[in-house]
């Protein structure tokens, strides 16, 4: 495969955005680009702060050879619109990182990338994958949308392999990557305000499979993900590998009774027993610690939420594509601990559990979170920026889990309307969004009054946080602080 040119000689580069990603891009371009112009209306040290003015945007790109766009910059922004009109290439940070990769210490080439995208579960899956790779004795890091900019990690020669979380924003301007293996976990309507349509959103997710070398991992329960694999132009010999919560067929990973099994990578191609055998990767008991409040089911089998099992299978598939042994998959899953604000139990008080799942920033994620609890036992704290989404399917499918709901955020009407239509019998408290500083304390107080012993108060907002909080993390911290003050 011909490697793409790193940067044009004497390149004049415009960097759109000076957040964490943009600053990492600027650092990476130091000494490589002839000039760098930064554009960000919210950064005091940006070279250009009025890039949203179309006339200014045209002047900025007029002399540029390249624009590197941070994930938050939608294609419709004046700067990127002007770049396209002027014929100036636009790259994502991921595209730049791919072109700047350095060789591993003691190896011939750069570290391979194992990449994950999806509407939900990306961060958990990538962190699970990094845990598995580490258990196999590899120097691995979870990078990308999960935290550390990829452009930094790609230049670290000490890493053996990168576990890369990619959002649809990051994939939109990614053009030449060729991941060792890639996974799309699921696809549900999200970020339609950014992409313009569901079809455009799905297409950007599918970019992750382009030129995949070893495996394209898809969700058997989500036909869109399999179709993206079918449509992808991959490296010859790359496998299509499905994961399923049921018994796997050949070429799949799945669950038999309480055992996680691999029927995709367990034998050499052409092996005589390939169709009839499977490798054991662990059991559901190895995942029980990832479900706060999980109870034992029939025969003592731990009840692990389906989305947790699905994430583990996807991570296992990517690790197996890299050649990791089955024992390391088991050890990595046992050792894995999720990050903050992901189904994290913050307190139990008077028989009521308080759980922070602030990372559930859309309806699909909130549905998965609610599914983990018994019927009629959840006081649901929900709301935020709706991003143009509908909540009817979420409420209709999970109404049986709810005892009550507390609605926060500026986009309350979509959730309140869905609750009125599909769960009219449950009490709903709407928290006035006017006083942002006290919104979570008031929400927690309302939830306390609604909950009964044995219930769970679950913060699973189904919306983005930026209406009243700086991030989902700050929203979760505000929840935990308010609960601690009860």
Model-derived features: where do they sit?
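Nucleotide phosphate-binding/pyrophosphate-handling subdomain across enzymes
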Residues: 3-13, 24-28, 292-403
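Short internal beta-strands
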Residues: 37-40, 217-220, 379-382, 401-411
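N-terminal leader/targeting and accessory segments in enzymes
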Residues: 1-100
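Residue-level signal for inorganic ion chemistry
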Residues: 29, 67, 116, 145, ...
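Phosphate-binding loop of NTP-binding sites
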Residues: 30, 58-62, 71-239, 480-486
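Beta-strand->loop->alpha-helix junctions that form or flank phosphate-binding loops
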Residues: 40, 91-96, 141-144, 233-255, ...
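Extended acidic/charged loop-beta regions that coordinate divalent cations
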Residues: 40, 54-60, 107, 159-193, ...
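C-terminal helical cap/extension that packs against the catalytic core
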Residues: 46, 392-455
